[in-house]
Amino acid sequence: MSATEIAVEAAGWGGAALILLAYLLLSLGRLTGQSPLYQWMNVAGAAGFVVNGWWHGAIPSAVLNVIWMLIGGIALWRILARRAASEVPDQGPAQ
């Protein structure tokens, strides 16, 4: 097995582990769907599946995981934007 093949398989198995761990932590109440860590785990896990699926010619799986990444990325962006907006100090009334 070449180094590339090993990296592709590691990406797939690592992606699977991340997505399963994210779901386990969500199900146990250790993370919420609004947790940046939960969303990052899903985005990174899906990226591993995209690499593995594309390499093996599993295009439907790769496309599904690109969409999964987009959903997670958008959710993460919204979570972080909300968090940043809530940290802006109140300027008070204009003088």
Language model features: what each stretch is:
Residues E5-A17, V63-M69:
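Structural signature of hydrophobic alpha-helical transmembrane segments
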Residues M1-V8, W54-I59:
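Helix-coil boundary and interhelical linker segments in multi-pass alpha-helical membrane proteins
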Residues I59-E87:
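C-terminal structural segments of small proteins and small subunits
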Residues A85-Q95:
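Short, charged juxtamembrane terminal tails flanking transmembrane helices
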Residues L20-L28, A47-W54:
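Alpha-helical transmembrane segments of multipass membrane proteins
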Residues L28-Q39:
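Short, amphipathic, aromatic/basic-enriched membrane-interface segments that mark the entry/exit
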Residues Y38-G48:
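Hydrophobic alpha-helical membrane segments
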